[in-house]
Amino acid sequence: MVREEVAGSTQTLQWKCVESRVDSKRLYYGRFILSPLRKGQADTVGIALRRALLGEIEGTCITRAKFGSVPHEYSTIAGIEESVQEILLNLKEIVLRSNLYGVRDASICVKGPRYITAQDIILPPSVEIVDTAQPIANLTEPIDFCIDLQIKRDRGYQTELRKNYQDGSYPIDAVSMPVRNVNYSIFSCGNGNEKHEILFLEIWTNGSLTPKEALYEASRNLIDLFLPFLHAEEEGTSFEENKNRFTPPLFTFKKRLTNLKKNKKGIPLNCIFIDQLELTSRTYNCLKRANIHTLLDLLSKTEEDLLRIDSFRMEDRKHIWDTLEKHLPIDLLKNKLSF
């Protein structure tokens, strides 16, 4: 962080993108300004945005690869220049763009001799490769080479224990961090009581989203993080009332779930994804972050479970109920669900 004295003043609070460029397919840069801020506010905003940009933005990446009968990740495959470990590292670097949630399947199936690049990955329709020229492996002989891949949207850095999988499947340490770097600087303006600060924010991304998109998502995540405090204030509920409040279960479904499964005419809840419901993006994202992907996942939760989800509110609870009423038969809801 840098502090400098500069001349000039800004009369109204505003933000603006002062510079934007594409250095390469996997390196985008953006520079933003926010002013005027009172003394100390620029640090508050800068620190919060930097942490949210680096740790809260979701990204899509390859999390697992299956090679077939490969004894361990340090093995070599006849006709391929790279070892299995080198191929895994190359797959880890592939940058993907997608709004999908949950685990999706992809694959590579080519015949040598030839170079294998990211362009050779067969992806689901809504997943896009940012840089198709990223290298994966070099086939030096006329062999058939196939890999089954798993793709997941997540946030942060996820590691898995290394095991020798008998089926040739190996985990890839997932780096779901579209924002590569963030820097902010603070400039002081004015004199005396009119002194204020200007915040400059620099963002570098990997090309799966623009710096402006990253800034928007980080800001939205911060707002969602503080909404519970605002909601509590609007309700006028004291801490003591909240502490002693008993929360009844949203869905008393577990005891009756067996009967529903036995009913041949029942709805296959594990085949209904929440993507198919008309949920708001806010409610949808809350559920996805909690690994709730199907209607069965949702109905297996109590209200206490849902309210423990980050940014989940009572309004989301009502919205879910209204949505279920719209999509499921009323008699099924009355018989199987209760508040």
Curated annotation (Swiss-Prot):
Transmembrane segments: none annotated. It is an enzyme of class 2 (transferase). SUPFAM superfamilies: C-terminal domain of RNA polymerase alpha subunit (SSF47789), Insert subdomain of RNA polymerase alpha subunit (SSF56553), RBP11-like subunits of RNA polymerase (SSF55257). One of its GO terms (molecular function) is DNA binding. It catalyses: RNA(n) + a ribonucleoside 5'-triphosphate = RNA(n+1) + diphosphate. Keywords: Chloroplast, DNA-directed RNA polymerase, Nucleotidyltransferase, Plastid, Transcription, Transferase. It holds the Pfam family RNA_pol_A_CTD. Its EC number is 2.7.7.6. Gene3D superfamilies: 5' to 3' exonuclease, C-terminal subdomain, DNA-directed RNA polymerase, insert domain, RNA polymerase, RBP11-like subunit. InterPro entries: DNA-dir_RNA_pol_insert (IPR011262), DNA-dir_RNA_pol_RpoA/D/Rpb3 (IPR011263), DNA-dir_RpoA (IPR011773), RBP11-like (IPR036603), RNAP_asu_C (IPR011260), RNApol_insert_sf (IPR036643). GO terms for biological process: DNA-templated transcription. Its main location: plastid. Residues 264-339 are annotated as: Alpha C-terminal domain (alpha-CTD). Residues 1-233 are annotated as: Alpha N-terminal domain (alpha-NTD). It is found in: Plastid, Chloroplast. GO terms for cellular component: chloroplast; DNA-directed RNA polymerase complex; mitochondrion. The keyword Magnesium does not apply. CDD domains: RNAP_alpha_NTD. Belongs to the RNA polymerase alpha chain family. In plastids the minimal PEP RNA polymerase catalytic core is composed of four subunits: alpha, beta, beta', and beta''. When a (nuclear-encoded) sigma factor is associated with the core the holoenzyme is formed, which can initiate transcription. HAMAP family: RNApol_bact_RpoA. The N-terminal domain is essential for RNAP assembly and basal transcription, whereas the C-terminal domain is involved in interaction with transcriptional regulators and with upstream promoter elements. DNA-dependent RNA polymerase catalyzes the transcription of DNA into RNA using the four ribonucleoside triphosphates as substrates. This is DNA-directed RNA polymerase subunit alpha.
